[in-house]
């Protein structure tokens, strides 16, 4: 390595430059680590699936809330259809109502956000039922598609059974 004879003159400048670079890198990394990603996923244009968040996704005009508690959201159309993430599963009539709400809102051109507490089980079940009906897909293909958009989707076993009943009823 070639070192200039007067390297001691440049040493403070080099040290300050390296320190400044380290500070910038640390701040950028800390910002990325601490910035929370939104707890929702775009399933397709105009259709979001997720968990509870302080604000619904951008441009959202309709919310279907499956949580046991109501939301503070102020959107054009809001439906609260609380269910527990446990057995027994709701019945097919309840599921038809939720799918009809999504269909109605999408037909009106509204962006729809379907959510439960974590965006995993209840909302995954309802979104799967909607897609199964619209696309005429079987349950497993629909869940595979949903997981490609939101990997954490895992409906409760009772909800999986309800989706099989839904598949056979359509």
Language-model segments: residues:
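N-terminal Lys/Arg-rich, disordered targeting/topogenic segments
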Residues: 1-8
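A phosphate-binding catalytic loop at a beta-strand-loop-alpha-helix junction
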Residues: 109-128
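Hydrophobic membrane-insertion alpha-helices, especially the h-region
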Residues: 12-27
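Intrinsically disordered, low-complexity segments enriched in polar/charged small residues
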Residues: 14, 127, 152-155
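Cysteine-based protein phosphatase catalytic domain of the PTP/DSP
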Residues: 32-113, 132-167
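Positively charged, low-complexity intrinsically disordered regions
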Residues: 9-10, 140
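Generic alpha-helix initiation/capping and coil-helix boundary signal
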Residues: 12-13, 121, 135
């Amino acid at each position: 390595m070639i070192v200039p004879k007067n390297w001691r003159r440049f040493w403070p400048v080099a040290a300050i430059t390296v320190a400044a670079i380290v500070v910038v890198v640390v701040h950028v990394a800390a910002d990325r680590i601490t910035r929370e990603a939104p707890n929702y996923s775009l399933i397709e244009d105009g259709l979001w699936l997720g968990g509870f968040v302080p604000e619904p996704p951008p441009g959202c005009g309709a919310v279907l809330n499956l949580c046991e508690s109501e939301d503070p959201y102020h959107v054009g159309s809001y439906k609260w259809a609380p269910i527990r993430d446990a057995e027994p599963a709701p019945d097919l009539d309840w599921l038809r109502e939720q799918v009809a709400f999504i269909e109605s809102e999408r037909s009106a051109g509204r962006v729809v956000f379907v959510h439960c507490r974590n965006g995993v089980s209840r909302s995954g079940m309802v979104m799967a039922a909607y897609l199964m009906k619209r696309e005429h897909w079987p349950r497993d293909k629909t869940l595979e598609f949903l997981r490609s958009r939101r990997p954490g989707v895992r409906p409760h076993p009772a909800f999986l059974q309800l989706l099989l009943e839904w598949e056979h009823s359509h």
